[in-house]
């Protein structure tokens, strides 16, 4: 059962104090940090001004990336002197690394004031208050989810694009991954709560939403009533329901799992106009032997079959992936099989990682670890292959018209080139010349159309000028320096029939109660 979130509420504990949240890791952590920011503002804190030292620094940590612990403790060491100069300064550590190293964070960095985990973000204000009162570090790590993060308010990072979690946790047992042990088994939100959160974002001008889950297409696997069997069509139904939300122009999701990626989801993608023609489908390895050792419950033939069906129904879909190089026991033959699959798959881009052992995962104890110099060589060969493919695939778009959602941050050379940056519907970044048929200043969140003139491996260039410019509510928000805030949305675990969200749901759902 979920605990009462009101027990952690400490009104005005941060009154007059500034805060900064520093995020390491994945999109889940980025979205969790939005919740932490909303929670802290509710407790009276305010975001620190640029160039000033915050009174509170919160680290939302990652345990997946290589050297995550070194990065955290190195940064904590740098803050030690700042805290000595300002005794009222507080430091909190949360997230996956805190969940994993619950017994060692304070031992390694005794100047930390509060430690919390992935399951109890809502406890942070209470921990900070107790730490200040008791003059000691307060550590509270729980082993099961206290409540969905969605019951916390959120201060969004973007005026035009928002994250919405559909679930927490993961039921897979990949031998290289520590996430399930840190975030627990999968638990799914009610469709009505998800739709209410999407609607609340759209009402404030957000035009693009990304649905988040560790295994997003397994949505619907775990209901509050154990007698209710899983609805294997739940995610496709959710996509179609989001398609009916007026004002939601772009819908994305990440990350799916190939083993559970079904025909109905592909059909929903193809038949729902606001679902973007983009798919991130993690491969991890092209070797069936390595996939078996990873406990990835699919093989390369199935993976390529999914891509073939997606492209048959969504001809211009952009497909990206994740690949691990140098998994224990990977031979040169295994690696060649990965290269062969990459050649056949024609990914738009690939996030490639050199395998490194993660303590607490089965693969960390495998005897046949691949030498680092071999891993590096294979990694460079894979990068070279994917860069060639990316360039070839991007070159096919030269001369085509693209619709871009203008981004707040762009290319490193934009100041020099006077270009701006937008993201196309298929997820590609495009640096464009902002001259042409424009309606006043082009702001982040506005929508423009232009023609691609040049292709690079990691982005496109459009120097043909703007053909159309549509000013948006998100652009107005960006120009005013504002971002959306979303109120708590209930924690329901059931899966009733999907319907339209209640108009006031996101404004009135303040408790841990359920309801669609």
UniProtKB/Swiss-Prot annotation:
Q: Which cofactor does it need?
A: [4Fe-4S] cluster
**UniProt remark on cofactor binding:** Binds 2 [4Fe-4S] clusters. One cluster is coordinated with 3 cysteines and an exchangeable S-adenosyl-L-methionine.
Q: What reactions does this protein catalyze?
A: N(6)-dimethylallyladenosine(37) in tRNA + (sulfur carrier)-SH + AH2 + 2 S-adenosyl-L-methionine = 2-methylsulfanyl-N(6)-dimethylallyladenosine(37) in tRNA + (sulfur carrier)-H + 5'-deoxyadenosine + L-methionine + A + S-adenosyl-L-homocysteine + 2 H(+)
**Which PROSITE patterns does the UniProt entry name for this protein?**
MTTASE_N, MTTASE_RADICAL, RADICAL_SAM, TRAM
Q: Which residues are in the MTTase N-terminal domain?
A: 17-133
Q: Which organism is it from?
A: Corynebacterium diphtheriae (strain ATCC 700971 / NCTC 13129 / Biotype gravis)
Name the record gives this protein: tRNA-2-methylthio-N(6)-dimethylallyladenosine synthase
* Residues covered by the TRAM domain: 395-466
Task: Give one GO term, molecular function aspect.
Answer: metal ion binding
Kindly indicate where the leader peptide sits in this chain: none
Compositionally biased intervals (Basic and acidic residues): 412-438
Please classify the protein's predominant subcellular localization into one broad category: cytoplasm
Task: Write out the residues that bind [4Fe-4S] cluster 2.
Answer: 170, 174, 177
**Gene3D superfamilies, per the entry:** Methylthiotransferase, N-terminal domain, tm_1862 like domain
Q: Which Pfam families match?
A: Radical_SAM (PF04055), UPF0004 (PF00919)
Q: What is its EC number?
A: 2.8.4.3
Quaternary structure, per UniProt, is:
Monomer.
**Residues reported to bind [4Fe-4S] cluster 1:** 26, 62, 96
Residue ranges occupied by any Radical SAM core domain in the UniProt entry: 156-392
Q: What does this protein do?
A: Catalyzes the methylthiolation of N6-(dimethylallyl)adenosine (i(6)A), leading to the formation of 2-methylthio-N6-(dimethylallyl)adenosine (ms(2)i(6)A) at position 37 in tRNAs that read codons beginning with uridine.
S-adenosyl-L-methionine is among the record's keywords: yes
* Renumbered residue ranges of the record's region Disordered: 409-438, 492-516
Lineage, broadest ranks: Bacteria, Bacillati, Actinomycetota, Actinomycetes, Mycobacteriales
> What gene name is given for the protein in this entry?
miaB
Q: Which family does it belong to?
A: Belongs to the methylthiotransferase family. MiaB subfamily.
One cellular component term (GO) for this entry is: cytosol
What are the protein's UniProt keywords? Answer: 4Fe-4S, Cytoplasm, Iron, Iron-sulfur, Metal-binding, S-adenosyl-L-methionine, Transferase, tRNA processing
